[in-house]
Swiss-Prot record:
This is Uncharacterized protein MJ0310. SMART domains: Robl_LC7 (SM00960). SUPFAM superfamilies: Roadblock/LC7 domain. GO terms for molecular function: guanyl-nucleotide exchange factor activity; molecular adaptor activity. Gene3D superfamilies: Dynein light chain 2a, cytoplasmic (3.30.450.30).
Length: 114
């Protein structure tokens, strides 16, 4: 069922792939391009999201809603999805507003599955 949510999410313009990873770094579901090592990306995304959560708490920002890694060739966005983290890989030039709204809806569906 999570795979269906990811497949639908991947239809959004600019999204190259998506996955749900546990807070422990283990892949729960993945719809990433074949050239991407899902287990490696999942472990790194979980670590990055965890560090961002701790940073947000330490500086008094409250609960972390989203974190983004932006590079020359694309972006990686991560949002809390209950027992997991929704990770989305995008092109460099994307409509971030659309991506964020679409991710929020997908994360809500995923939360309901846990």
């Amino acid at each position: 069922m999570i795979d269906r949510v990811l497949l639908e999410l991947n239809k959004t313009e600019g999204i190259k792939g998506s996955m749900v990873v546990g807070k422990d770094g283990l892949v729960i579901a993945s719809q990433l391009p074949g050239s991407v090592d899902a287990e490696l990306v999942g472990a790194m995304a979980s670590a990055a999201f965890g560090a961002a959560e701790r940073t947000a708490a330490e500086i008094g920002m409250g609960t972390l809603e989203q974190t983004m890694i932006e590079g020359e060739h694309g972006k990686t966005l991560m949002v809390d999805a209950g027992e997991g983290i929704l990770v989305v890989l995008t092109d460099a030039k994307v409509n971030l507003g659309l991506i964020r709204i679409t991710m929020k809806r997908a994360a809500d569906k995923i939360k309901a599955m846990f």
